């Protein structure tokens, strides 16, 4: 199976995407090319195989769409742009902010935004606890960033404009029993959703949290 067919079939398996995924497919493939080009010198991701990138990065990022509310999205610890760039490609009407502390990875994100032509993405290089945003944030998402408690402690200020409305989504593999037990009471878990990534057997869970200041 070639890359285009693999990706196209995977996109078709995600109901939240439009029936015509051809344009999205071509842009995601271009994104994979950029990652491969930069990966040799910048070590953006340990996943080197393009086929694995489709499943473990692109489709893994896009299955969160039904649980994400826009238009204001923040991707904390974005790394090579997951899930923020695939989400921004699929939802061009949303405004996505990528937060990344690593200078080399942030440089890649800026280049990817430029080459992919993504005016709905902004890149913030720095530690998330130091980042200040003027616009309203609807969803803050993290993937392989840290524990639930640390993610929330460092990111909670991003919801200061409307903490009742903003939701935090942590993308996890196995059900995070221990991390849930360690969460402070101000971080209210609203739901935990098991999600299926097309072509991936590994377990995936989304933890949806609301910040409730004392």
From Swiss-Prot:
EC numbers for this chain: 2.1.1.170
Residues engaged in binding S-adenosyl-L-methionine: 77, 82, 128-129, 143
Record's keyword terms, sorted: Cytoplasm, Methyltransferase, rRNA processing, S-adenosyl-L-methionine, Transferase
Example GO molecular function: rRNA (guanine-N7-)-methyltransferase activity
Catalysed transformations (reactions): guanosine(527) in 16S rRNA + S-adenosyl-L-methionine = N(7)-methylguanosine(527) in 16S rRNA + S-adenosyl-L-homocysteine
Subcellular location: Cytoplasm
SUPFAM superfamilies with a match to the protein in the record: S-adenosyl-L-methionine-dependent methyltransferases
First-level EC class: transferase
Cellular compartments per GO CC: cytosol
Pfam families named in the record: GidB
Assigned protein family: Belongs to the methyltransferase superfamily. RNA methyltransferase RsmG family.
NCBIfam families noted in UniProt: rsmG_gidB
Function: Specifically methylates the N7 position of guanine in position 527 of 16S rRNA.
Cited HAMAP family: 16SrRNA_methyltr_G (MF_00074)
UniProt-recorded name of the protein: Ribosomal RNA small subunit methyltransferase G
Organism (species): Nitrosomonas europaea (strain ATCC 19718 / CIP 103999 / KCTC 2705 / NBRC 14298)
Lineage: Bacteria, Pseudomonadati, Pseudomonadota, Betaproteobacteria, Nitrosomonadales
Encoding gene (name): rsmG
């Amino acid at each position: 199976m070639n890359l285009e067919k693999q990706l196209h079939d995977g996109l078709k398996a995600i109901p939240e995407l439009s029936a015509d995924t051809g344009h999205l497919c071509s842009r995601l493939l271009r994104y994979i090319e950029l990652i491969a080009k930069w990966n040799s010198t910048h070590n953006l991701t340990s996943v080197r195989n393009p086929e694995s990138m489709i499943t473990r990065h692109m489709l893994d990022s896009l299955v969160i769409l039904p649980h994400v509310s826009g238009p204001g999205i923040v991707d904390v610890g974005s790394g090579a742009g997951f899930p923020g760039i695939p989400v921004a490609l699929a939802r061009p009407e949303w405004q996505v902010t990528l937060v990344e502390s690593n200078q080399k990875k942030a440089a890649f994100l800026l280049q990817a935004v430029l080459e992919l032509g993504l005016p709905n993405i902004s890149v913030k290089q720095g530690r998330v606890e130091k980042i200040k945003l003027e616009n309203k944030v609807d969803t803050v998402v993290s993937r392989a960033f840290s524990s639930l408690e640390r993610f929330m402690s460092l990111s909670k200020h991003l919801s200061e404009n409307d903490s009742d409305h903003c939701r935090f989504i942590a993308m996890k593999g196995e059900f995070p029993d221990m991390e849930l037990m360690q969460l402070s009471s101000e971080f209210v878990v609203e739901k935990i959703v098991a999600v299926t990534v097309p072509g991936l057997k590994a377990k995936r869970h989304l933890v949806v949290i609301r910040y409730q200041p004392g």
